[in-house]
């Protein structure tokens, strides 16, 4: 057999192998122990079934169970076992789709009677039985006609619809596990036994076919799977902790906000919640001023002609809230929409008046109230809403200023996250997608600048930031940075973005006058730090489990009395606290002190000052911190000084110490 392909390995070595060698044969040629551990291989970055032949030269890696990439294979294969288990137990059920998602997988089923939570235990037991059979995953390529006939004969009409949607030039792959089979792109682990037992079915939910409310309602079963029992246990423990921190529950207990049916995805902010929101806005306003941004405000409602120019009307219209004057109809040219994004408005502000290169960079920021029509099933407290405020900014600069502006934005983003206690940051650079605007030369230039910025950030971060490059994941209008932070229980939240835009300046014919007195198109940078202010507040509530830092807390201090004899003294203390700039209220109710302390603790008030007859006579207070059983007796002036210092926001503290 001739040696016709050359393979490069992670250790830098390179060897020739016979064409059509399988991944398993390749692993066996390296070592028997590796072959036993192997579950798939990667060729030039594409993960493939272990028994697939290698038809071309390139970079190759054998993937074992411990490889992070193995998790997707395990979960994908587990979804297939779930579908087989359901059809063994409930033969009348049609299977539809079963993708891998973040932290697990799901499968959608069509049946007259939806599954119940009680059914999950039965299904999970059957799954373990199927895994124990250790049947091989076997791939076949079928013709379109054969696939449609077989699935039609089985009554799997959703599969027939999926087959019709697959492009003619793509193979139809069918994966068998024993006698059961499914339409699937793959890849999978070699056999059901290699899924292991570290999996669990989590919940049942309803889902419309293809996410369209006009289609039939299906029953979705969610599950998760890991490479080992310890990882599964850690994940389930994290979920248990996350439930305790759920911002929706804490929002009720702390009396921050609520939702109701008349305004789905729209937040009703209560006084305490709105105070916390405004504290966040005030913090960011100071940071914007520090970094030389100009705050602006653009209209909420704009004519569709503007959205047509920006491109939103063509590709985002279904997510926009539209309106017309009472005298008009939908066919009239004067159709309006609530803005889903701030950028077109900021472009109009930049265009108003002639700009010179001497004026650049111009940094326009807005706490813009946006409206986006999200599907009702996707709404989730503050994390996914239909009306939200974005801490949006757009920087208009010259090409020469791009790198420096990206670095300045990075400094602002990282220092902001640090102020809220987020020290573990993941930064991803997303490069050109297949469908994009702009020439290759333009993309080459922008990506080279962003790559240079990334290297500078890595050097200055000194290990604080993990970085990666996502090939082909950029926006159609330019490359972008995405900032992801880790919270107190290890969850990742994508928040900040820095995006270069070639599209809008060209669409709106934006220009400035350069040194040669010629019109020149500026570089436009989209930038957000919190992203959605509401979502970031939800993240903070969960990260701190409601124990907000004193400077951010909506109600910082409660002064409560033991007896009515101390009422006048308590009100005097409250007035002094307010005069010092602190948020304080008096609780003079004739309730037992332990009852009042418990109530305020449930509402997550950071500091409770207890006053009785002795405190009023000694001009002191008993200070109790949230989460602590200890009380400290302090003179009132000392307590106020201590709390006033503690309540200084981190950005102001930096300024005072500089």
Swiss-Prot record:
InterPro entries reported in the protein's UniProt record: aa-tRNA-synt_IIb, aa-tRNA-synth_II, aa-tRNA-synth_II/BPL/LPL, Anticodon-bd, Anticodon-bd_dom_sf, Beta-grasp_dom_sf, TGS, TGS-like
Q: What is its main location?
A: cytoplasm
Q: Which amino acid positions bind Zn(2+), per UniProt? A: 343, 394, 526
Q: Where in the cell is it found?
A: Cytoplasm
Pfam families hit by this protein: HGTP_anticodon (PF03129), TGS (PF02824), tRNA-synt_2b (PF00587), tRNA_SAD (PF07973)
Q: What is its EC number?
A: 6.1.1.3
Cofactor binding annotation: Binds 1 zinc ion per subunit.
Q: Which reaction does it catalyse?
A: tRNA(Thr) + L-threonine + ATP = L-threonyl-tRNA(Thr) + AMP + diphosphate + H(+)
Q: Which PROSITE patterns match?
A: AA_TRNA_LIGASE_II (PS50862), TGS (PS51880)
Subunit description:
Homodimer.
**What is its biological role?**
Catalyzes the attachment of threonine to tRNA(Thr) in a two-step reaction: L-threonine is first activated by ATP to form Thr-AMP and then transferred to the acceptor end of tRNA(Thr). Also edits incorrectly charged L-seryl-tRNA(Thr).
What's the protein name? Threonine--tRNA ligase
What is the protein's species of origin?
Bartonella bacilliformis (strain ATCC 35685 / KC583 / Herrer 020/F12,63)
């Amino acid at each position: 057999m001739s040696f016709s392909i050359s393979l490069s390995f992670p250790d830098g070595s390179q060897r020739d192998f016979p064409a059509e060698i399988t991944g398993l044969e390749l692993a066996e040629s390296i070592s028997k122990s590796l072959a036993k551990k192997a579950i798939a291989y990667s060729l030039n970055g594409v993960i493939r079934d272990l028994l697939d032949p290698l038809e071309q030269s390139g970079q190759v890696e054998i993937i074992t169970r411990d490889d992070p990439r193995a998790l997707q294979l395990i979960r994908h294969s587990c979804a297939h076992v779930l579908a087989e288990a359901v059809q063994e137990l409930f033969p009348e059920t049609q299977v539809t789709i079963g993708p891998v998602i973040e932290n697990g997988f799901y499968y959608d089923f069509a049946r007259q009677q939806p599954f119940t939570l009680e059914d999950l235990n039965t299904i999970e037991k059957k799954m373990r039985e199927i895994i124990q059979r250790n049947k091989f995953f076997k791939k076949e390529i079928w013709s379109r006609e054969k696939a449609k006939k077989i699935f039609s004969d089985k009554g799997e009409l959703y599969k027939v619809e999926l087959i019709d949607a697959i492009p003619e030039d793509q193979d139809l792959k069918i994966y068998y596990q024993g006698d059961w089979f499914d339409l699937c792109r793959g890849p999978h682990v070699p056999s059901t036994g290699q899924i292991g037992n570290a999996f669990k079915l989590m919940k049942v939910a309803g889902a419309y076919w293809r996410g369209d409310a006009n289609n039939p309602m299906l029953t979705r079963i969610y599950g998760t799977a890991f490479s080992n029992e310890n990882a599964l246990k850690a994940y389930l423990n994290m979920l248990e902790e996350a439930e305790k921190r759920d911002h929706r529950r804490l929002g009720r207990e702390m009396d921050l906000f609520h939702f109701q049916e008349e305004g789905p995805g729209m937040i009703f902010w209560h006084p305490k919640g709105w105070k916390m929101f405004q504290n966040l806005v005030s913090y960011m306003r100071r940071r914007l001023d520090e970094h030389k941004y100009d705050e602006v405000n653009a209209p909420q409602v704009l004519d569709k002609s503007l959205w047509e120019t920006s491109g939103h009307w063509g590709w985002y219209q279904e997510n926009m809230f539209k309106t017309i004057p009472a005298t008009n109809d939908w066919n009239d040219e004067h159709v309006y929409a609530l803005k889903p994004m701030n950028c077109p408005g900021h472009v109009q502000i930049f265009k108003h008046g002639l700009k010179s290169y001497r004026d650049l960079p111009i940094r326009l920021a807005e706490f813009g109230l946006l409206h986006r029509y999200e599907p009702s099933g996707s709404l989730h407290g503050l994390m996914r809403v239909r009306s939200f405020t974005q801490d949006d900014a757009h920087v208009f600069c010259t090409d020469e200023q791009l790198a420096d502006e990206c670095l300045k934005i990075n400094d602002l983003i990282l220092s902001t996250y640090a102020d809220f206690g987020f020290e573990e940051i993941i930064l991803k650079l997303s490069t050109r997608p297949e469908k994009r605007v702009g020439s290759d030369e333009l993309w080459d230039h922008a990506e080279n600048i962003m790559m240079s910025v990334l290297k500078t950030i890595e050097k200055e971060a000194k290990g604080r930031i993990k970085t990666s490059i996502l090939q082909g994941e950029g926006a159609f209008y330019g490359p972008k940075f995405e900032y992801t932070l880790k919270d107190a229980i290890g969850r990742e939240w994508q928040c900040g973005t820095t995006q270069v835009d070639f599209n809008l300046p060209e669409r709106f014919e934006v220009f400035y006058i350069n040194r040669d007195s010629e019109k020149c198109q500026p570089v436009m940078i989209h930038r957000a730090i919190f992203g959605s202010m509401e979502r970031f507040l939800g993240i903070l509530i969960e990260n701190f489990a409601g124990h907000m830092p004193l400077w951010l807390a909506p109600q910082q201090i409660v002064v409560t009395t033991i007896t009515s004899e101390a009422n006048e003294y308590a009100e005097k203390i409250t007035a002094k606290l307010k005069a010092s700039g602190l948020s304080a209220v008096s609780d003079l109710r004739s309730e037992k002190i332990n009852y009042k302390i418990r109530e305020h603790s449930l509402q997550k008030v950071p500091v409770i000052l207890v006053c009785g007859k002795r405190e009023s006579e000694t001009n002191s207070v008993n200070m109790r911190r949230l989460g602590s059983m200890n009380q400290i007796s302090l003179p009132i002036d000392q307590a106020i000084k201590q709390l006033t210092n503690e309540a200084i926001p981190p950005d102001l503290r930096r300024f005072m110490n500089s």
